[in-house]
């Protein structure tokens, strides 16, 4: 970890400033867009449906990722981690919970959309609430395991944020990684791809699918794939042989996912977009109520 007034190994002054600035921009953009999405759900009755509850879960998870990025950005600009080892464990846990919840919520939204548009039965509240509860409980379970000894949280190469420690590459890390990745990356990615593919096949014959069926899977793959590749490399070789700057790239890419998700799921939905606009325009909302 970089101490106060010193630069992390492998980074120059401008590089540390650049990483901190990028993280800050990603954090603020992700927070602002996802908080607006959450407010639109709370204040717009039309959005209080089981299907939109899944999108709300995704927005909450992405807000958590952005908060995690904000802490990392602040520490990067300070050029040190000011919260101690316990703060590092808490930061790693919170970031891992929200990352897994975001990935699994994306899969839940994909399944919910397929269920809504391609089946005759509507998604009910019991199913939606149970699904959201399962996503968050499962994410908390997997994120807690490194705190209990299966896996480990440690500082990232910049020394100003914390994540799953991949530098050891031992049997403990390898067994945790492959098990966790199957249930929390490969399986959600499979559900997302299959759900939207089935939507294209069923709805494409008669009309254009009402939602973007390509971007969600690409976001999962491109947003979290670099982390998966880095972790996979760490199981077969010494990850420290990769330059510290290159090791930070997956983190910077992943922190952009909340902004992309908000633009796709919220701003890309006419109803959610209308709800956000009503939150930003109180007079318009009052006028709509009078009508």
UniProtKB/Swiss-Prot annotation:
It holds the Pfam family 7tm_1. One of its GO terms (cellular component) is plasma membrane. Covalently binds all-trans- and 11-cis-retinal. InterPro entries: GPCR_opsins (IPR050125), GPCR_Rhodpsn (IPR000276), GPCR_Rhodpsn_7TM (IPR017452), Retinal_BS (IPR027430), RPE_GPCR (IPR001793). GO terms for biological process: cellular response to light stimulus; G protein-coupled receptor signaling pathway; phototransduction; visual perception. Keywords: Chromophore, Disulfide bond, G-protein coupled receptor, Glycoprotein, Membrane, Photoreceptor protein, Receptor, Retinal protein, Sensory transduction, Transducer, Transmembrane, Transmembrane helix, Vision. The keyword Isomerase does not apply. It is found in: Membrane. One of its GO terms (molecular function) is G protein-coupled photoreceptor activity. Residues 1-15, 74-91, 152-175, 241-247 are extracellular. The modification N6-(retinylidene)lysine is found at residue 255. Glycans are attached at residue 172. CDD domains: 7tmA_Retinal_GPR (cd15072). This is RPE-retinal G protein-coupled receptor. The lineage of its organism: Eukaryota, Metazoa, Chordata, Craniata, Vertebrata.
């Amino acid at each position: 970890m970089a101490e106060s007034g010193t630069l992390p190994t492998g980074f120059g002054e401008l590089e540390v400033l650049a990483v901190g600035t990028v993280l800050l921009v990603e954090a603020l953009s992700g927070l602002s867009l996802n908080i607006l999405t959450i407010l639109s759900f709370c204040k717009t009755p039309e959005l209080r449906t089981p299907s939109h509850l899944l999108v709300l879960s995704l927005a909450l998870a992405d807000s958590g990722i952005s908060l995690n990025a904000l802490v990392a950005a602040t520490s990067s600009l300070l050029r040190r981690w000011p919260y101690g080892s316990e703060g590092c464990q808490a930061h790693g846990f919170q970031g891992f919970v929200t990352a897994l919840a975001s990935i699994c919520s994306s899969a839940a939204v994909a399944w919910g959309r397929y269920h809504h548009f391609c089946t005759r039965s509507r998604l009910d509240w019991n199913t939606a609430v149970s699904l959201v509860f399962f996503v968050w409980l499962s994410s908390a379970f997997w994120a807690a395991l490194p705190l209990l000894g299966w896996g480990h949280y440690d500082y990232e190469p910049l020394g100003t944020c914390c994540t799953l420690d991949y530098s050891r590459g031992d049997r403990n890390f390898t067994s945790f990684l492959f098990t966790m990745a199957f249930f929390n990356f490969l399986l959600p990615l499979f559900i997302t791809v299959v759900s939207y593919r089935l939507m294209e096949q069923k709805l494409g014959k008669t009309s254009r699918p009402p939602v973007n069926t390509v971007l969600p899977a690409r976001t999962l793959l491109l947003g979290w794939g670099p982390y998966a590749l880095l972790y996979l490399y760490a199981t077969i070789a010494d990850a420290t042989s990769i330059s510290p700057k290159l090791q930070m790239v997956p983190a910077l890419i992943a922190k952009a996912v909340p902004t992309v998700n908000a633009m796709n799921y919220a701003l890309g939905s006419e109803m959610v977009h209308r709800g956000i606009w009503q939150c930003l325009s109180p007079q318009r909302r009052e006028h709509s109520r009078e009508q």
